[in-house]
Amino acid sequence: VYCSEDKTVQGLGGKDEVTGQMSPKNMLTTTICDELRLNSNFKSKVIGIAIKDRGSILPAGHSANAAYWYDGKSGNFITSTYYMNTLPNWVNDFNNRKVTDSLYKLNWNTSLDKSVYLNYATADIKDYESKPFGKEQLGFPYDLTRYVGKDFSKISSTPYGNTLTAEMAKAALIAEQLGKGNATDFLAISFSSPDYIGHAFGPNSWEMVDDYVKVQNLALQKKKQETIAKWSK
């Protein structure tokens, strides 16, 4: 049994209703988000966001207003009928932006001088790496443009998966007006790409180091003041 599998619900936003049959039904305890909702008499708003379904669903708890996760088949953030009957307009608008394709066009190269990676990681190319971008792409730089409009799943194994998650979180923050009511809201964000990258390349890889370098420069942090200005209107 998969931790967040739920065949009693239907997926929303993916290629079909089977994709996205997920919920917190199998979780046998409450979370901090559940306790927050209970304490506020369900006035607090709770939303979970992640690339992985379990990274979005489980932290947000049983009583979340929504949980959204990434569907690598469609390139959309999706949810299930456990939370709602239709996707909100703002989620459809976000999906229509095709953020994944925009990020693919940036390709993936190192952010710092190669000497930095030599200090913190092993050699750039190791036999045990799973080569998620094909056997012909061994080590930096990685050409991601080949996946534009074709394979939306590869984003998860790059630092741009973090950027995609952050952009979705920003959209939720603004559209749902989180933090503007009298009750405390909770936006549960999980960054899944470090796990994908670690499994694909190893914890001491150049890719892992570069992922954490890029995490520090996320658009969510760079545009903090811009986000707050939009949100506070």
What are these regions (language model features)?
Residues P203-Q216:
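Active-site-proximal segments of metal-dependent phosphoesterases and phosphodiesterases across multiple
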Residues V1-N182, S192-D195, H199:
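His/Asp/Glu-rich, glycine-adjacent segments
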Residues K214-K233:
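Metal-dependent active-site segment of extracytoplasmic phospho-/sulfohydrolases and closely related
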Residues A183-D185, F201-N204:
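Composition- and surface-driven signal marking solvent-exposed, interaction-prone regions
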Residues F186-S190:
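Structural motif
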